[in-house]
């Protein structure tokens, strides 16, 4: 199993190209199931989750061709995927595929909308009522689907097609919004989604669907209106830049000091996080190339932050901010309001010397001057990259184990950081 070896203490200086957003690329790839024509997606990151979704779509009979420059080539801007779902041969998504990535459950929406049936495994470890799957099922039932759960599978059917309806979510859900949005595009009549998620990735998917012939308005607001159409066609769409990757590298620069241009980053996608970084002492300068992040000389200021749905501070940057605050000049407070059990990185940060106290959903971080390198274990995607950020500023060597989590969401992470002066390398098993 691969590991990441880091020798801390180096400042970061240079340019980091920001990849396409994984959280947009995945639903965009799934949306290709809505049409018999080819959907072309540009700026798709090369990630383990993208590769896994390609396998899942292939299981349904979808043809996918990848083109474009390889990482490391001059002017690399992600891969281009040509996705053709002209002949969907299987409407079953089996457990052995879905269990490896929760977002793969979303294939239920386009399969049901276009083929009028779907049989999709519940994601691994997913209990109805405690994960957002119950909200996804609620949305499909509102649109007229008949749903049964048998043998760990959600079996959905709509023999006469889906019907437009009002889908009112009891709480904001990104997954539920994606599923309702895709399913409603081919439903008869009008669908109104209320309490919809407002994330930029929702807007990106809606923009692509409209290019395919859908009639979606209001994406990016809590109320989305979809006028159903009879069919969707092919289109070409460029995946928006990854705001979580942008925020992660910005926090890495704030942690180590230095100055880095995050090329292709768009500040409006993560303004709340940039405001927190400014409060923490980083210099944030948007320009026509992206966002320049610097911290030269000044220390790191403590902050108090609560995660929130967009446009608030993203839960997917919570672990990275916590790593940064371990070296702040004072006490910081971070409250997690989106997900339960999202402080698994605390124990591993403590191995590097961090002083963190948990009280329910709030972490209190007492900043210290120096972290110490140590072997650590990645527990999930965002936790793993927080350990990398901490290791970049730690004294001595940090070895991050189980880095397959990183490969799910960060394209060429060690190469991007190494190019800016970090002492970081992948040790292959």
Swiss-Prot record:
Gene Ontology biological-process annotations: cell division; cell wall organization; peptidoglycan biosynthetic process; regulation of cell shape; UDP-N-acetylgalactosamine biosynthetic process
Active site location: 126
Keyword hit for RNA-binding: no
Modified residues (2-(S-cysteinyl)pyruvic acid O-phosphothioketal): 126
Positions that bind UDP-N-acetyl-alpha-D-glucosamine: 102, 131-135, 316, 338
UniProt keyword terms in alphabetical order: Cell cycle, Cell division, Cell shape, Cell wall biogenesis/degradation, Cytoplasm, Peptidoglycan synthesis, Pyruvate, Transferase
Primary localisation category: cytoplasm
Amino acids binding phosphoenolpyruvate: 22-23
Function: Cell wall formation. Adds enolpyruvyl to UDP-N-acetylglucosamine.
Full protein name: UDP-N-acetylglucosamine 1-carboxyvinyltransferase
Protein's organism: Nitrobacter winogradskyi (strain ATCC 25391 / DSM 10237 / CIP 104748 / NCIMB 11846 / Nb-255)
